[in-house]
Regions:
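C-terminal segment of N-terminal export signals and the immediately downstream linker at the start
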Residues: 23-54
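Conserved hydrophobic/aromatic beta-strand scaffold that supports enzyme active sites
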Residues: 65-67, 85, 109-111, 132
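Conserved short histidine dyad/triad with adjacent acidic residue
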Residues: 64-80, 113-114
Length: 137
């Protein structure tokens, strides 16, 4: 069995202690300003399709997962929505959901009903990413 010097043992111990003290956080992928598909009439808002498949939820044929990337100052006008679940991945947005305003911050989740309306605006100084799971009839 090889002998380990006191100096090596202390160095290894300090390295392990330092590594365990650093918190590791998962971070959502931020997108560049030109990634994805530009949304017509909504300057600074881009759509990135992530996945789509059939659903087993009755009344719906498809579920679609996408990210909406809002550059600072970008606005999505209040418009009719289909059923969906929204999750704030990065940044912060001012949301109007059926006329009720609120601030969506990182990790917030909310829903939209069929026939309801929603608008969003990025009033912060950094890009924001909203992940959307759309339920399509």
């Amino acid at each position: 069995m090889p002998r380990v010097s006191r100096r090596t043992a202390i160095a290894v111990g300090l390295t392990v202690a330092a590594a365990s003290a650093v918190p590791i956080q998962a971070k959502a992928a931020m997108y560049g300003p030109d990634e994805g598909e530009a949304m017509e009439g909504m300057e600074g808002v881009r759509r990135i399709a992530l996945s789509e498949r059939e659903t087993k939820i009755s009344g719906f044929k498809t579920v679609r997962l996408l990210d909406l990337v809002f550059q600072p100052g970008a606005k999505f006008p209040e418009s009719p929505m289909e059923p969906m679940i929204c999750h704030m991945m990065e940044g912060e947005l001012q949301i109007a959901n059926n006329g009720d305003p609120f601030t969506a911050k990182k990790n917030d989740v909310w829903t939209c009903n069929a026939g309801g309306t929603e608008g969003a605006e990025n009033t912060a100084g950094e890009p924001a990413v909203m992940r959307v799971a759309q339920l399509i009839a």
